[in-house]
Structures are given as C-alpha cells and as structure tokens.
Amino acid sequence: MPRPSAGSHHSDKLHVKKGDTVVVLSGKHKGKTGKVLLALPRDQKVIVEGVNLVTKHVKPSASNPQGGIEQREGALHASKVSIVDPETGKATRIRKQIVDGKKVRVAVASGKVID
C-alpha cells in the first residue's frame, strides 16, 4: 500500500455527495449554486454543474471526429462548497444523526433531514 504524501492529512470522506445542491462559499464563483456532478473524496474535490467552467482543447478522435474547443466544469475544493438547506435555501453545515436506525445528514440551521 503506498504511503500518503506529506501534505495529505485528510480522510477519504466528504460532506457532500453526488446529486446534492451546493453553494460556492469563496473564490470567483462565490454565491453560485449547482448540483454536484462528481465527488472526488481522495482529492477532496467536487465538480459542480455550471460552476468553474474551463476551456478544453479536444483532439479529433473516432468518437469525436470534429474535435475543437469545449467548455467543461472544473473541480473545486470541497471546503469551498456548502450544502443548501432544503427549507431556507441558504448554505448550511451538516450534522450526522441516527434516525430509525440509519445514519442521516441533518441541516444544522433548520434541523431538516437532507437524505
């Protein structure tokens, strides 16, 4: 098993999952909301729909004979996003609780179950 690098002091867990609606807390995309398309727990990054669009130059290939320039969502660090509270529509932290024998995520601000 490879040793973790010196700078990796995080666990492989994230507070967001694929499909969550999140808001960006900092950076040039601050305030934008979108759905999580992909969560990358080992890198502590998430890809959010419509946020942090980057330009990619794509070579022509068998599946894409035209090639060209396209816009794609880039990854954001997970600490820069927060889950949107389903009741208030604002950013909230989450807490984990056991409800009916299952561990669920609960919005701290409203107490509403998220999943």
Curated annotation (Swiss-Prot):
Source organism superkingdom: Bacteria
Coiled coil segments of this chain: none
Pfam families: KOW, ribosomal_L24
GO-annotated molecular function: rRNA binding; structural constituent of ribosome
Entry-linked CDD domains: KOW_RPL26 (cd06089)
Transmembrane regions: none
PROSITE patterns: RIBOSOMAL_L24
Record GO biological process: translation
GO CC term, one of those recorded: ribonucleoprotein complex
Keywords: Ribonucleoprotein, Ribosomal protein, RNA-binding, rRNA-binding
InterPro entries associated with the record: KOW (IPR005824), Rib_uL2_dom2 (IPR014722), Ribosomal_uL24 (IPR003256), Ribosomal_uL24_CS (IPR005825), Ribosomal_uL24_KOW (IPR041988), Translation_prot_SH3-like_sf (IPR008991)
Cleavable signal peptide: none
Function: One of two assembly initiator proteins, it binds directly to the 5'-end of the 23S rRNA, where it nucleates assembly of the 50S subunit.
Quaternary data: Part of the 50S ribosomal subunit.
NCBIfam families assigned: rplX_bact
Family, similarity comment: Belongs to the universal ribosomal protein uL24 family.
Name of the featured protein: Large ribosomal subunit protein uL24
Organism: Deinococcus deserti (strain DSM 17065 / CIP 109153 / LMG 22923 / VCD115)
Native organism taxonomy: Bacteria, Thermotogati, Deinococcota, Deinococci, Deinococcales
